[in-house]
A protein has these predicted regions:
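Bacterial Sec-dependent N-terminal signal peptides
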Residues: 1-22
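Catalytic-core signature of thiol
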Residues: 21-185
């Protein structure tokens, strides 16, 4: 019986040694005809700012396509400025205008025309809380609560500083400075 098992094992070993691999069928092979330059890939992470990332990415790609050079604009600069304007509109309409994450292509164009653009190095995402990516969960919770309290509150008159700037605007700007960083001048 031992001889039979040994003979069978040797036979299997020899047969497996003679087996040939099946030729692998190679799939379709792409050939690069023309390679267009591209901008860096961005990650919005945990922020409802796809509107800003996609629009600025489109503008950067268009500048590159037109031969104007490679740019990397700061999404957080546009987000910071447009959120402050949105907060003002939400308070003026007593909350009838939505103050929340999200936006549109036009918000970036509006921000670009009104505030301009700065390079990413001036205002990086996540830098204020030791990250390289955005996380606006806490920012949204805090700023939404402040804007809702002022917009839907029953205050007959809002407090202002000596220059007649409403204090709530300074509070919202400070919140955004803390989470997004101060805006460069």
């Amino acid at each position: 019986m031992k001889k039979l098992l040994t003979l069978a094992a040797m036979g299997m070993f020899c047969i497996s040694g003679m087996a040939q691999e099946q030729p692998k069928e190679e799939g379709f092979v792409f050939t690069t005809v023309k390679e267009n330059p591209i901008t860096s890939i961005k990650n919005q992470n945990r922020a409802g700012t796809c509107w800003c990332y996609s629009t600025l990415s489109f503008l950067e790609a268009e500048l590159l396509r037109m031969g104007k050079g490679e740019y990397d604009f700061s999404e957080m600069f546009i987000v910071h400025n447009t959120y402050l304007d949105r907060a003002d509109k939400a308070v003026r309409t007593h909350g009838d205008i939505s103050f929340s994450q999200g936006g549109s292509f036009y918000d970036v164009i509006y921000g670009m025309e009104k505030f301009g653009l700065v390079p990413e190095e001036e205002m990086r995402p996540g830098v204020m809380y030791g990250d390289t990516l955005s996380n606006h969960n806490e920012l949204t919770a805090v700023s939404d609560a402040v804007v809702a309290a002022i917009a839907k509150g029953r205050l007959s008159k809002l407090q202002a500083d000596a220059n007649n700037v409403p204090l709530w605007k300074k509070a919202i700007a400070s919140i955004h400075d803390i989470y997004l960083g101060e805006r460069p001048e």
